[in-house]
Regions:
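Residues at the starts of beta-strands that form the adenosine-phosphate
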Residues: 17, 42, 128, 155, ...
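Internal alpha-helical scaffold of NAD(P)-dependent oxidoreductase catalytic cores
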Residues: 150-237
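Interdomain hinge/lid region at the active-site interface
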Residues: 221-289
Length: 314
């Protein structure tokens, strides 16, 4: 989609040129949100897949689709790595020599310590490296999946490394705020633990539950599809997320994810025991306590209490 020229109506321009490396859901949504707000001058982009580059060019996702990551970052004031965590090091190696002095390199990865370890060694001293993580997404992927509203009222966590320039950090915060996000800072290891609780372990549980249904010989595929209740449909939506991205997340956040899965297993055993022994009080008390988390999410504006059971509205 070609966006109109909004320069006469736009907010203060934060970066003259932004390069997006990787052109999937997050990068595409960033491009749409940048155009919506008019907060950048030019957007360049690169994706490893020639098919993705072709599609991105055809739909006008960015102003210029480049044939290499090195070409895309030349002259860019902000470079955002929107690739799976496992690909970060190789991309950083490629773009390092071509980065503009004074530029900022950031990312959108769901793991932060591994990204810092992979990327930081390849960033020149005259370039700012400021990791970030927008807590937004859908199960969709690819250059046509993005939309400008993805980050609206969602958190973007900025994870500065030691010695990060404060002015460059504030500039990146302003950029994400203008894309619609609420912005906060968090230390890398704490980020990885928090996300293991709120995102990584839940994804693994969803993959597992859908896998159990797929393996259960006594239940046919048609029954799983036709009689899926709201809870299972939520699992299938999560389990439809990009396999490469989530493989890399789990392999690069092992310690925190395994810690949370260990605690989950202990809780699950306790619930199994309560069911086996008929301990209804334990079950009721547990469900009452956990119910308050949902209400807290709604009150924080991160979801609504509107009924939505995945039915197509007529």
């Amino acid at each position: 989609m070609r966006w109109p020229d909004l320069k006469g109506l736009m907010m203060t321009q934060i970066y003259e040129r932004v390069a997006l490396i990787g052109l999937g859901l997050i990068a595409g949504s960033m491009a749409h949100a940048m155009r919506r707000g008019g907060v950048v001058g030019e957007i360049t982009g690169y994706a490893r897949s020639a098919e993705t580059r072709k599609t991105a060019a055809e739909i006008g996702l960015v102003d210029r689709v480049c044939d290499s990551a090195a070409e895309a970052v030349k002259g860019a004031d902000l470079v955002v790595l929107c690739v799976p965590v496992g690909a970060m090091a190789s991309v950083a190696t490629e773009i390092g020599p071509h980065l503009k002095a004074g530029a900022t390199v950031s990312d959108v990865g769901s793991v932060k310590r591994a990204v810092i370890d992979a990327v930081a060694p390849h960033i020149p001293e005259n370039v700012h490296f400021i990791p970030a993580h927008p807590l937004a997404g859908t199960e969709k992927s690819g250059p046509t999946s993005g939309f400008a509203e993805l980050f609206d009222n969602r958190w973007c966590l900025i994870v500065p490394v030691e010695g990060t320039d404060k002015t460059a950090t504030e500039r990146l915060k302003e950029f994400w705020a203008d894309l619609g996000a609420k912005v906060d800072e968090m230390e890398a290891d704490h980020h990885d633990l928090v996300l293991a609780v709120t995102s990584h372990a839940p994804h693994l549980i969803a993959y597992t539950m859908v896998g159990v249904a797929d393996d259960l010989g006594r239940v046919t595929d048609s029954e799983v599809v036709n009689y899926s209740a709201a809870g299972f449909r939520d699992f299938t939506r999560i389990a439809a997320s990009d396999p490469t991205m989530w493989r890399d997340v789990f392999l690069n956040n092992k310690e925190a994810t395994l810690e949370i899965l260990g605690r989950f297993t202990e809780e699950l055993f306790a619930l199994q025991r309560a069911i086996r022994t008929g301990d209804g009080d334990h079950l009721h008390d547990y469900f009452t306590r956990t119910r308050t988390i949902r209400q807290g999410i709604i009150e924080a504006g991160q979801d609504t209490d509107a009924a939505d059971f995945g039915r197509v509205k007529k």
